[in-house]
Amino acid sequence: MQNQKIRIRLKAFDYHLIDRSAQEIVDTAKRTGAVVKGPVPLPTKIERFDILRSPHVNKTSRDQFEIRTHLRLMDIIDPTDKTVDALMKLDLPAGVDVEIKLQ
């Protein structure tokens, strides 16, 4: 697996959870001897929703809700077979979405 790169993209609503997961991935990859670049914080996606408070009148009275999606990007340069096995066995929290691409 020489001259290859693994790109890992993490997505979560809770930034504490995503930072902890990113640190676990970095520690695991460094323990197996791989070079890690990142985690790079990507821009947070914010979705806002306005909802009417009243079911009938009072259009000017609204509640506002938002969902923040935090993103992190990491590259693992020249991963070994040990690195791939260790990353596959890694147990991450349920609130973190992981996308892995081999380049």
Curated annotation (Swiss-Prot):
SMART domains: Ribosomal_S10. Keywords: Ribonucleoprotein, Ribosomal protein. InterPro entries: Ribosomal_uS10 (IPR001848), Ribosomal_uS10_CS (IPR018268), Ribosomal_uS10_dom (IPR027486), Ribosomal_uS10_dom_sf (IPR036838). One of its GO terms (molecular function) is tRNA binding. Gene3D superfamilies: Ribosomal protein S10 domain (3.30.70.600). GO terms for cellular component: ribonucleoprotein complex; ribosome. Pfam families: Ribosomal_S10 (PF00338). GO terms for biological process: translation. It comes from the Bacteria. Involved in the binding of tRNA to the ribosomes. Belongs to the universal ribosomal protein uS10 family. NCBIfam families: PRK00596.1 (NF001861), rpsJ_bact (TIGR01049). Part of the 30S ribosomal subunit. This is Small ribosomal subunit protein uS10. The gene is rpsJ.
